[in-house]
UniProtKB/Swiss-Prot annotation:
Its main location: membrane. This is Peroxisomal biogenesis factor 3. GO terms for cellular component: endoplasmic reticulum; peroxisomal membrane. One of its GO terms (molecular function) is protein-macromolecule adaptor activity. The keyword Hydrolase does not apply. It comes from Eremothecium gossypii (strain ATCC 10895 / CBS 109.51 / FGSC 9923 / NRRL Y-1056) (Yeast). InterPro entries: Peroxin-3. It is found in: Peroxisome membrane. It is a single-pass membrane protein.
Amino acid sequence: MARTGLQRHRGKLLGTGAVLGGLVVAGVVAAVAAKRWVRRQQQRLSEQHYVREQIKRRFTQTQQDALYTMYELVPVLALVLGKELDVEELVETLKGKKLKRAGEDDEQGSGGHASAGEGSVSSTVARSKAELWQELKMRSAVKLLAVVYTTCMLLLLTRLQLNILARREYLETAIRVAKGEEATRRDAAGWLGAVWEYGAAALGALGPRPAVTAVEPVDQHEETRYVNEQAFLSLSWWLLNRGWLQFKPLIERQVEQQFGTLSPRDTLSMEQFSARLSNTIHAVNRELFDSDSRALLLRALLPDATEELHVLQQTLDEGSLRVIERDDSMLRELLQETCRCAESTASLIVLESLVNESFQFVMQQLETKVTKKLRKPATDAPEADGAADAPSQKFQVALYSVALKDCCQEMLKNGLVSMNNEYLQDLDAVPELDDLSASVYSNFGV
């Protein structure tokens, strides 16, 4: 009876079993497909997270490299400014004249009356000493502002250069990796097509092969890229050696307007000196960063076409120069982008922010150094007239001049080993500088 029932409903049972089996298989396939889809999504999110972290790490490392580069360039700037605006020699000369005058006073005290001729020599010495103090007053202020503006421009230029190069390197690496992954996928999925292509080629079914375009050897391409990048980075030589001279007359003119009428014996409070220095900086900013005179800023930052070859000859060897003569297309692209960035409003805002930070640093250092010099005998300044002890706390202009000299030394301190140049650290921490660097680094549309 049961066998008869099974035989009678065998078709239905088989059909039902097939349907159930199909549903189970479909469910398993759907589950596997869903699992694979989830795995792919997780992998994609993981890759995106990795890429973002990689970009952040590269960006952070690039900014650190820029700071290290500044530590390497500051000693060069110190040598250049020390030669062009030598205030140490003036101070040593003044010290020598003070010792000489003290010796003459001792001789007059022990040897009786001095002759008329000796009095004439003494007046000459006194007059030349006054002239030296006047020169120290002007030169120390000019050097201070030259240090401020050159260092700020050098930091901006270094950030622009390294971030542009880092972005290009990242894009080239990403494209190379993407091509490699695409080739791997083609090799894994197209083995049957490869067999067919091989057979078709053997039968002549593919027709003539397309002509192969000559490609530059990899080694030569890498050499050209490397030399162009080095040439691009070496252009900071211009700012260090020639570029800062473009705005030096502007600084001298503004310093003369604010400090020219002051005598080294005149006294100013810290607030009064700060106001004069601030007025000088604002006047320089108006002419240097004004939208109508950005040509002066560009001439200071980068050499023009007539000076570019001279700069490269100073920084590259003969082999590298031959590579540049053969192909400088990458250098041209890098320079064009740097000029666009330097001319932008964002760069001007960054420069003004760096100069303002420099002013704050200078005033802090100045107050500390002036106060410290009052605690010990002023061996290298004119005799104090008691104004420094007054309640108004006014100090001689001569004392400010010597303090400015010391401030320049602090700002140009060689901290390459210990990385302890406080001035560079303060500039490197300016938020606007990081904002501009991030904008340049992430500008993948260039």
